[in-house]
Amino acid sequence: MDKLRITGGSPLRGEVTVSGAKNAALPILCASLLTAEPLVLGNVPQLNDTSTTLRLLGRMGVRAERAGDGTVTLQADQVDNLEAPYELVKTMRASILVLGPLLARFGQARVSLPGGCAIGQRPVDQHIKGLAALGAEIEIEHGFVVARATRLKGASIRTDMVTVTGTENLLMAAVLAEGQTVLENAAREPEVVDLAELLIKMGARIQGHGTDRIVVDGVARLHGARHDVIADRIEAGTFLCAVGAAGGDITLRGAAPDTMGATLDKLVEAGLTIETGPDWIRGAMHGRPRAVGARTHEYPGFATDMQAQLMALDTVADGTAVIVENIFENRYMHVQELCRLGADIDIDGHTAVVRGVARLSGATVMATDLRASASLVIAGLAAEGETLVDRIYHLDRGYDRMEVKLRALGASIQRVTGKETA
């Protein structure tokens, strides 16, 4: 099992390119099921999750070709299998995103209940409720969501909570439904907007994406399109937290700063010097960061996917920070590992109190989920001595060659196999 060996204490300097957003790429790949015509997607990140999605689509009969420049061409003109099996779905919760497209275009689907990071229940009941409102007959059989419909019919749907994947699934189902669908309490995330922009290029009629009320007028069919996946705001924020903790001066190319308002505000509050352009961000930290608290919230609030990285920055900051996790339960599993490095953190329910320390010291730590992995890498970059991060397959689910990019910024970080760490 691969690990990362990090020798901390070196500031980060230079520039790297931000990859396409995982959380946009996954639903966009699944949208290929909505048409028999080719879909050409640029800026698709090379991640375990995108590879799993492509394997899942391939199992269904979707033909996919990946070019060296990050372009993926998909064509779903020979789909002959409408099932997403547990063996693929168990590793990635986003596999549920094939449910809406399959149901809308083919009238049936059989999708295993999902897995993914162990950071809370994240139930799919809102997906099921919404699809049922569109006229689908849905049952849970032997661990599978089994759905059938002759043709979906437009409806007004209000989800009980803001759900990103739920909004995306219902959006993809609604574009081929008969009549108008109104999604109330819809997710406003940039990744939802990116999916909607692709669907519009494919011939969908969508209004209101980026707000909490999306209106979809269904069409009979969609056609092929060309689309570039939006930049990953979480990857960009992770690298900025890294320079905040380790010090230095970095520039991120291919970024989307207009999607990162809440994160950039927190980093400025922490003492980073931030400069932005249309597609770049420069972040510099000279001296010790200031402790900064945060409450996670749906977009445009502070993202839950940035909570662990900000906490890693706070572990070496001057002062005390209070972080409140409002989105998911069980998302403080990185805390005990940060404490192994010398962090001073107390947890009380959804609240974490982080007292900054003058220095962290390297140790062996274990990643527990995707963003927790990133927080341990950040802490390792700031720590004195050597840190070994185990179970980095979590990291590979959502970061495109993180150690390669960090080395380009001057970090001492190497991927090693289990044998090499003995």
UniProtKB/Swiss-Prot annotation:
It catalyses: phosphoenolpyruvate + UDP-N-acetyl-alpha-D-glucosamine = UDP-N-acetyl-3-O-(1-carboxyvinyl)-alpha-D-glucosamine + phosphate. It comes from Bordetella pertussis (strain Tohama I / ATCC BAA-589 / NCTC 13251). Its EC number is 2.5.1.7. Keywords: Cell cycle, Cell division, Cell shape, Cell wall biogenesis/degradation, Cytoplasm, Peptidoglycan synthesis, Pyruvate, Transferase. The gene is murA. Pathway: Cell wall biogenesis; peptidoglycan biosynthesis. Its main location: cytoplasm. UDP-N-acetyl-alpha-D-glucosamine binds at R93, R122, P123, V124, D125, Q126, D305, I327. One of its GO terms (molecular function) is UDP-N-acetylglucosamine 1-carboxyvinyltransferase activity. This is UDP-N-acetylglucosamine 1-carboxyvinyltransferase.
